[in-house]
């Protein structure tokens, strides 16, 4: 039996030799686990067996090392900035522009403040002398005979009007009690004083914008040629309007100085801090607006005027405080930190404001040199032989700085704070006056030299020799072209020096002196025959582009920070 079984086993295996492996594989396939009792079955090695095994191992390795791989990728990941070279170069230039803004802005501010100082010193030094010379000519006119149809030149008439307005407003300011105003303001709450100070700033800008129009109307009405048809209310009403304006503006500046004095004398300095924080609110109102070059020039002029006015207000505050403490020099050192804090906050606000305005509007720092050249052009053109207007008036139109109200207030404060008694005191006053004249002359000489340099660097000499005509802005003048031809033989430097240093000669009667050159300053004094020409010129101006030259930007839109 055993032999049969043994013999049958190979027979079965031999008879089913071909099916043996399949049966074995099928049995193993049917019983993969072997009932769970035997050892783990071994898989048959087929095509792609090792590849699938490697995939499983890779998946298992990736699942285990995903965090390490992420960290290594983050630590070793690279990038190339060369793909955005233009963008990064532009960002770097913006940084460099912001770094240059403080230097360029302060150069403009420094030049502009000395321009305002020159116009301000003119009221105290040269204006009284010019008024004296005009009155002397008026008194001695019968000795020379009436060879001229005019008693006085237009510039002399304007000087006399300025002097009379200054004297009348000075005596009117004596009826305003500074001490009562100080105690009235000091009794108010801090928040109310803060609101009052903001209202005074707005009112000061409005007064400055409209005040020069009143003064220009007075000057033009008083000096208008008699041959032209007059359509105005007369010189006397314009004169009273000018006196009223200067008086009200002087009172407004006095209230500003009194409020600042109360802030200085407060115990906890809270009001002074609030008033300084008002400057930073100005950043919010200016930085996020769209500005062009002309608008920025306009705002820069306003900042120059505001900074110079603040300096004069601080001087008035120091004079009043020193008077209260009997001119004790120790008290000056008590005021010195507060004065420095106010000045530093003003400078910081201007720098931050201009830096971000130039950044957001893609304006380069070189634009401030153009602004400086434009201000220098005003100074040089006012020193020419036949200038259109006085220099102090050109500064008022350009920056909105009107020196008459501020001069009236300063004279009132100085005369009430300093008592002049004895011959020695009067001698000191005379020496101080001659010192002011020397300072004015020195300042004018330095400013004139620097202005000529800035005009040459900006290549604006041709505009000096061939200025645009004032009567017809849209048409070229044949007279200016004929005058410009013989000057081409000389060098520009010789022409510039000759035109600046030459004194104004006697004008003929047929030459009409024009006070204002802008189209918005035409008064109701034109003859009927010229009305059609003016309407045609106005229609031509409407079709022009909205952008203007920097030399045409004045203080007429300085409050709105916009240019039509």
Swiss-Prot record:
UniProt record, GO biological process: cartilage development; cell projection organization; embryonic skeletal system development; neural crest cell development; ossification; positive regulation of bone development; positive regulation of cartilage development; positive regulation of cilium assembly
Positions where Phosphothreonine occurs in the chain: 526
N-acetylalanine modifications at: 2
Keyword vocabulary terms for this entry: Acetylation, Cell projection, Chondrogenesis, Cilium, Cilium biogenesis/degradation, Cytoplasm, Cytoskeleton, Developmental protein, Differentiation, Membrane, Osteogenesis, Phosphoprotein, Transmembrane, Transmembrane helix
Signal peptide range in chain numbering: none
Family annotation (InterPro entries): Tatp1
Gene inactivation effect: Mice die during perinatal development and are the cause of the L5Jcs1 phenotype. They exhibit posterior-to-anterior transformations of the vertebral column midsection, similar to mice deficient for Hoxc8 and Hoxc9.
Any single Pfam family the record assigns to this protein: DUF747
Disordered, as annotated region: 1-55, 464-546
Membrane topology type: Multi-pass membrane protein
Tissues/organs with expression: Ubiquitous. Expressed throughout embryo.
Basic and acidic residues composition bias: residue spans: 20-29, 532-546
Domain of life where this protein originates: Eukaryota
A GO cellular component entry from the record: ciliary basal body
Transmembrane segments: 108-128, 154-176, 233-253, 332-352, 400-420, 429-449
Modified residues (Phosphoserine): 520
Family: Belongs to the TAPT1 family.
PANTHER family: TRANSMEMBRANE ANTERIOR POSTERIOR TRANSFORMATION PROTEIN 1 HOMOLOG
UniProt name for this protein: Transmembrane anterior posterior transformation protein 1
Gene source species: Mus musculus
Lineage summary: Eukaryota, Metazoa, Chordata, Craniata, Vertebrata
């Amino acid at each position: 039996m055993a032999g049969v079984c043994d013999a049958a086993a190979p027979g079965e295996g031999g008879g089913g030799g071909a099916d043996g492996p399949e049966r074995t594989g099928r049995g193993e396939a049917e019983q993969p686990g072997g009932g769970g009792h035997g050892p783990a079955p071994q898989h048959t090695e087929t095509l792609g067996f090792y590849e699938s095994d490697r995939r499983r191992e890779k998946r298992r390795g990736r699942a285990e090392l995903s965090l390490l791989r992420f960290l290594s990728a983050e630590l070793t990941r690279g990038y190339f900035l060369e793909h955005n070279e233009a963008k990064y170069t532009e960002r770097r230039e913006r940084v460099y522009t912001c770094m240059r803004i403080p230097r360029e802005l302060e150069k403009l501010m420094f030049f502009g403040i000395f321009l305002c100082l020159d116009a301000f010193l003119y009221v105290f030094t040269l204006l009284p002398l010019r008024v004296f010379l005009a009155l002397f000519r008026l008194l001695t006119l019968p000795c020379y005979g009436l060879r001229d149809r005019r008693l006085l030149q237009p510039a002399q008439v304007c000087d006399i009007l300025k002097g009379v307005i200054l004297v009348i407003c000075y005596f009117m300011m004596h009826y305003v009690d500074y001490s009562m105003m100080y105690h009235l303001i000091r009794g108010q709450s801090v928040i109310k004083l803060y609101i009052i100070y903001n209202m005074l700033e707005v009112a000061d800008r409005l007064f400055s914008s409209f005040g020069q129009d009143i003064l220009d109307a007075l000057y033009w009405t008083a000096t208008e040629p008699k041959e032209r048809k007059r359509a105005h209310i007369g010189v006397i009403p314009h004169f009273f309007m000018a006196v009223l304006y200067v008086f009200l503006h002087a009172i407004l500046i006095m209230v500003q100085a009194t409020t600042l004095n109360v802030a200085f004398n407060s115990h906890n300095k809270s009001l002074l801090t609030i008033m300084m924080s008002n400057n930073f609110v100005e950043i919010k109102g200016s930085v996020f607006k769209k500005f062009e070059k002309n608008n920025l020039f306009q705002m820069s002029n306003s900042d120059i005027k505001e900074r110079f006015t603040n300096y004069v207000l601080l001087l008035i505050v120091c004079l009043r405080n020193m008077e209260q403490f009997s001119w004790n020099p120790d008290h000056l050192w008590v005021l010195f930190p507060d004065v420095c804090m106010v000045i530093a906050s003003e400078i910081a606000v201007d720098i931050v404001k201009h830096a971000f305005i130039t950044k957001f509007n893609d304006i380069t720092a070189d634009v401030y040199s153009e602004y400086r050249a434009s201000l220098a052009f005003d100074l040089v053109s006012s020193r020419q032989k036949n200038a259109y207007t006085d220099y102090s008036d050109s500064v008022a139109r350009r920056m909105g700085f009107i020196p008459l109200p501020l001069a009236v207030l300063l004279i009132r404060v100085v005369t009430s704070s300093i008592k002049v008694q004895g011959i020695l005191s009067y001698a000191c006053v005379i020496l101080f006056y001659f010192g002011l004249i020397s300072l004015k002359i020195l300042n004018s000489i330095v400013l004139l030299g620097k202005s000529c340099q800035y005009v040459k660097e900006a290549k604006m000499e041709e505009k000096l020799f061939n200025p645009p005509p004032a009567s017809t802005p849209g048409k070229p003048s044949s007279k200016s072209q004929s005058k410009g031809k013989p000057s081409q033989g000389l060098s520009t430097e010789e022409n510039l020096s000759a035109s600046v240093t030459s004194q104004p000669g006697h004008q003929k009667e047929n030459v009409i002196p024009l006070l204002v050159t802008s189209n918005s300053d035409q008064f109701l004094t034109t003859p009927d025959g010229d009305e059609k020409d003016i309407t045609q010129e106005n229609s031509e101006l409407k079709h022009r582009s909205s952008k203007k030259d920097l030399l045409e930007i004045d203080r007429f839109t300085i409050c709105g920070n916009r240019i039509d």
